[in-house]
Design a protein with these regions (language model features):
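Charged helix-capping and loop-helix junction motifs
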Residues: 115-121
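A short alpha/beta connector and helix-capping loop motif
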Residues: 12-39
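Catalytic beta/alpha-barrel core
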Residues: 27-32, 111-112, 130-138
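Active-site-proximal loop/turn and secondary-structure-junction residues that shape catalytic pockets
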Residues: 8-10, 31, 59-61, 103-108
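Glycine-rich nucleotide/cofactor/substrate-binding loop typically near the N-terminus or early
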Residues: 8, 45-47, 51-65, 69-70
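Glycine/small-residue-rich loop that forms an oxyanion/phosphate-binding "nest" at active or ligand-binding sites
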Residues: 62-104
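Acidic (Asp/Glu)-rich catalytic clusters
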Residues: 16-22, 41-54, 93-96
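Hydrophobic faces of well-ordered beta-strands that scaffold small-molecule active sites
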Residues: 2-6, 25-27, 53-57, 100-104, ...
């Protein structure tokens, strides 16, 4: 089976067009983009199109759309990641679905490939989900 996956909820407002063409999506959950309204819209569309729903956390950096490496303490990054994912998960559960996967965004995703400590912070932060969903990694 082929899984066509797409990042959504990032402010382009094209989810209605893209959702029927994909199998799964990564929904921005407040770090680089996304808010309650956009997350809710994306989750509703995902459910209506039977798409797998993923969280798309990032460095907390809306100014640079999560595209730049952010120097942030381990504790602050961990708190941000947990808040981002749990915010989306609450919406998913309220709408009767479940979190299928987690895929980091932008600089966080790319930096983890080269930075073991950052990777460990990320994995520790999302460890609560290890038996519940898939992890899309670099």
């Amino acid at each position: 089976m082929i899984n066509i996956n797409c990042d959504l909820g990032e402010g382009t407002n094209n989810e209605n067009i893209i959702m029927p063409l994909i199998n799964s999506c990564n929904i921005a959950c407040g770090g680089h983009a996304g808010d309650f309204k956009s997350m809710t819209k994306c989750v509703e569309l995902s459910i209506n199109h039977n798409n797998k729903i993923g969280a798309h956390p990032s460095f907390p950096d809306k100014k640079n759309f999560g595209r730049k490496t952010l120097k942030i303490s381990k504790d602050d990054l961990s708190k941000s990641l947990i808040k981002q994912i749990s915010s989306l998960e609450k919406i998913i559960i309220q709408l009767g679905s479940k979190l299928h996967h987690i895929k980091a965004h932008g600089a966080l995703y790319n930096d983890m490939y080269h930075d073991r400590i950052l990777s460990e912070i990320y994995l520790d932060s999302i460890s609560k989900y290890k038996d519940q969903c898939y992890l899309y990694i670099p």
